[in-house]
Amino acid sequence: MGSPSLYSARKTTLALAVALSFAWQAPVFAHGGEAHMVPMDKTLKEFGADVQWDDYAQLFTLIKDGAYVKVKPGAQTAIVNGQPLALQVPVVMKDNKAWVSDTFINDVFQSGLDQTFQVEKRPHPLNALTADEIKQAVEIVKASADFKPNTRFTEISLLPPDKEAVWAFALENKPVDQPRKADVIMLDGKHIIEAVVDLQNNKLLSWQPIKDAHGMVLLDDFASVQNIINNSEEFAAAVKKRGITDAKKVITTPLTVGYFDGKDGLKQDARLLKVISYLDVGDGNYWAHPIENLVAVVDLEQKKIVKIEEGPVVPVPMTARPFDGRDRVAPAVKPMQIIEPEGKNYTITGDMIHWRNWDFHLSMNSRVGPMISTVTYNDNGTKRKVMYEGSLGGMIVPYGDPDIGWYFKAYLDSGDYGMGTLTSPIARGKDAPSNAVLLNETIADYTGVPMEIPRAIAVFERYAGPEYKHQEMGQPNVSTERRELVVRWISTVGNYDYIFDWIFHENGTIGIDAGATGIEAVKGVKAKTMHDETAKDDTRYGTLIDHNIVGTTHQHIYNFRLDLDVDGENNSLVAMDPVVKPNTAGGPRTSTMQVNQYNIGNEQDAAQKFDPGTIRLLSNPNKENRMGNPVSYQIIPYAGGTHPVAKGAQFAPDEWIYHRLSFMDKQLWVTRYHPGERFPEGKYPNRSTHDTGLGQYSKDNESLDNTDAVVWMTTGTTHVARAEEWPIMPTEWVHTLLKPWNFFDETPTLGALKKDK
């Protein structure tokens, strides 16, 4: 996983321009020698701590990851997580500024009173590759006679050891007797190469060219496309017809071209991108100024535009629409503090997180983001398996407009672009609460150089309402609060920002939330209002959300790969359908509520649209709770949100996108575990001609009876735009759940029984 962040994005201003009467205590001594003093504000901000001044109490509050510190100027003692700590040198004031000794950070934040971070004594076998391991893998690959100088790196990641060995390590402390290996994917021009490197023995194990596949779009492709556009006379002439004389003000967005069986006139074996463009008018929001009906097709190998596709000229919307607040007055909001005065309730040991009864491993992947692994729940002293590995499997954002600049738009954000690579650093106090621990993560860039992403993942505990409550008449109230541990990650893919939360509940439930925010992809039109002559045609495929701007209808479809091991690897898929049946037992009632229960025995039958009136369980037929019920987890692909996709993809069955990406149309898939089956859209979905993902994985229709199975959960929203989402979109959430079902013997949050005296 990552290291705690050394930088804080929260811009906390010290309120020190007040009538403080503390005099500069010079010289200041520590251990008999003169102390070297440094400015508190600058020093602690660079360290990544929040600094707050309470004018009424005349004290500072300092917050950094698991440490919560209170200290008064001139005091010889600080309070760290509720415990007193003697200071070698007090905080002193001079000219209304606070100064601390250069040993202050070490004295306070390394005092041992913050127990959030623990030293990892046994490296977890699923730890992501370190920067040194990435460098080692690249050196070994580059030493191959087959390596060419212009080869770029798509992914460099851990090739995990066998699942059985990892579980034995996690539960029984058995060492993994397998060398660390790196899985390396490269692009030699348009050709994909896969390599495996043995890091322990420092050797190349395999080198495999991949045929009939296109690789990811890499970050340097964006710069290449912009350069090609800037130097194209043909493109300059095309934008000039639209009243744009300075082509360098045109911002390009390179997009994958999809697959249409040659009907788009594009060569299948060429490495192509379609480029749509926007005009930078200086308002900080070029997305509001689309250059409509103009598409440039760029060949990345030839480094040139091979085709320009044009439709009727539509004037570029020119009204400024900044979203950064430059033209607004921010509302006055009183501060809200989240404090943990005695420290965190969780610990982070290397890449393992322990909170209440949960233990799990956390790492970062350049394609799908956070990987949650070896998830166990401590049930009265027994560690029980819940999930071997969970992550975003993949996602797609398909648009429903058939026009020239829109018909090909179906963004496979993780599979085509790499959402881990596009991680957005988390802003403390805005993107995550101020009490969050922010973790840096390291991945490889396209040159194979390790790249640290600051504040890549946030971990925090939060209040989540009552866990349970009952008020018996005449008796004391019985209730307890619900706490949740959240692992948050954000990826920015072009105009949209996606927030993913993995939420652990004390009662054994795991929630997975996906939030979409950012800027809508909009279409330039002639209509200013719905009363204009062209309004009906202009809004056939979307909503008029501003003058001359339509938000086009589309979907955000997420799929999560969940290798659940419910109290063990061998599980079965069980259906429970509540039904109304006649009352045959007598009495005044004519009907009863009953449940039809049956097993779903194979992969093709398991692929289903989600009916919220039914129950689907992954059950362990070999384990029972004390009442004799099989222990299970309920799979809930949609547990609330906006515009659910429960009825599937909004495409006709004869569409190529429908055939290439089956995962879109059904919300529940279950397949037999195979370690190489990792992505619902397939390993290389860019311009794929057929389904190489879940449609292929389930084609052999393997049995799901009492076997190691993987759950693939599809959810999302059908996004019909509205004015309230423009020019920037409030976060729209969709929620999913994995809920224990007879997994426990009783309410799991009651606590342990008191021991007899």
UniProtKB/Swiss-Prot annotation:
Q: What is known about what this protein does?
A: The enzyme prefers aromatic over aliphatic amines.
Name the residues that bind Ca(2+) 1.
Answer: 563-565, 708-709
Give the reactions, separated by semicolons, that this protein catalyses: a primary methyl amine + O2 + H2O = an aldehyde + H2O2 + NH4(+); 2-phenylethylamine + O2 + H2O = 2-phenylacetaldehyde + H2O2 + NH4(+)
Modification(s) after translation: Topaquinone (TPQ) is generated by copper-dependent autoxidation of a specific tyrosyl residue.
UniProt-listed PROSITE patterns? COPPER_AMINE_OXID_1 (PS01164), COPPER_AMINE_OXID_2 (PS01165)
Which organism is this protein's natural source?
Answer: Escherichia coli (strain K12)
Pathway the protein takes part in:
Amino-acid degradation; L-phenylalanine degradation; phenylacetate from L-phenylalanine: step 2/3
What is the activity-regulation note? Inhibited by 2-hydrazinopyridine.
Q: Which GO terms describe its biological process?
A: amine metabolic process; L-phenylalanine catabolic process; phenylethylamine catabolic process
Positions that bind substrate: 411-422, 493-498
Q: Does the keyword Amino-acid biosynthesis apply?
A: no
Gene3D superfamilies (UniProt xref) = 3.10.450.40, Copper amine oxidase, catalytic domain, Copper amine oxidase-like, N-terminal domain
Which PANTHER family does UniProt cross-reference here? AMINE OXIDASE, COPPER AMINE OXIDASE
Gene name as annotated: tynA
| Gene Ontology molecular-function annotations | calcium ion binding; copper ion binding; primary methylamine oxidase activity; quinone binding
- Indicate the residues that form the catalytic site: 413 (proton acceptor), 496 (schiff-base intermediate with substrate)
Q: Which residues form the signal peptide?
A: 1-30
Tree of life domain: Bacteria
Q: What is this protein called?
A: Primary amine oxidase
Q: Where in the cell is it found?
A: Periplasm
Q: Where is this region: Disordered?
A: 680-701
**Record's GO cellular component terms:** periplasmic space
Q: Which residues bind Ca(2+) 2?
A: 603, 697, 700, 702, 709
Textual note on the cofactor:
Binds 1 copper ion per subunit. Can also use zinc ion as cofactor.
